[in-house]
Amino acid sequence: MARNKHPEETVSLILDVAARLFMEKGYEHTSIQDIIDNLGGLSKGAIYHHFKSKEDILVAVTDRITSESNRMLADIRDQKDLCGREKLQAIFKESINRPEQDAIFTVAPNLGANPKLLFSMLGETISDVAPNYIRPILEQGIADGTIEAACPLELAELIMMAANFWMNPMVFDDSVEKVRNKTVIFCQMMKGLGLDIVDKELTDRMVELTAVYQKNR
C-alpha cells in the first residue's frame, strides 16, 4: 500500500467525520464501522493506523474542543481592563455559555465508561487549566483586593475539579435534579471561600446542558 503523503489530512478527515457522527447519533451509538462508512473510501486500516480505538478518536475530538476553550481562557486571563474577580466571573460565564458545551453534551459520552478520556480531562485540568489560567486570575484578585482567599493554586484545582467533574453529569450520570442540587452547593461553597461570583444563571445553564446529555444518551 502506498504511503500516505498527507497523514494530517487523513487525521483531520477522521476527526471531522467522527465529530459529526457523535453529534448526530451520540458517542455510545456510533461505531467504528459507522465512521468508516462515512470516510469516502478510507479503509479500517487507515483509521487504526492513527487511532487504536473509538475512545482514542473521542479523546482527539475532545482535544480539539479543549484547545478552543483554552484560547478563551487565555484571552480573559490576559485582559488588562478587568480585575481578578471580574475575570473569574467572565471565565464562568463564557465557559458555561460557549457553543462547544452544547456539542460536548450532545455527543454525550459516559465518562465513567471511557476512562482514557476521563483521565485525559483530569490531567488537563490539574496540569494546565488550574495552574496556567485560573491560578493567575486568583493571584491577581488577591493582589488587587477583589478576591479574599489563600493558596491560589490549590483553590484553582478545587474550583476546576468541582466545576468540571463533580458537577458534570457525564462523569456520574446524574439526573437533572441532582445536578441542580450540586450547582446550589457549589455556589454556597464558592461564597464560603470568599468567591461570591456564580449565580442562578450557572444553575439554569447546567440544568439545560444536563437535559441535553440525558436526551442524547
Model segments located where?
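Helix-turn-helix
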Residues: 2, 13, 21-56, 60
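Hydrophobic alpha-helical bundle segments that form small-molecule/ligand-binding pockets
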Residues: 73, 129-159, 163, 167-174
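C-terminal peripheral helix-coil segments that are non-catalytic and often amphipathic
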Residues: 139, 143-144, 175-217
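Short, basic, alpha-helical segments at the C-terminal edge of helix-turn-helix-like DNA-binding modules
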Residues: 63-70
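Amphipathic alpha-helical core segments of compact helical bundles
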Residues: 93, 160-164, 168, 187-191
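Short secondary-structure transition hinges
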Residues: 100-146
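Hydrophobic alpha-helical connector segments
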Residues: 60, 74-107, 156-159
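A short secondary-structure junction motif
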Residues: 42, 68, 98-106, 141, ...
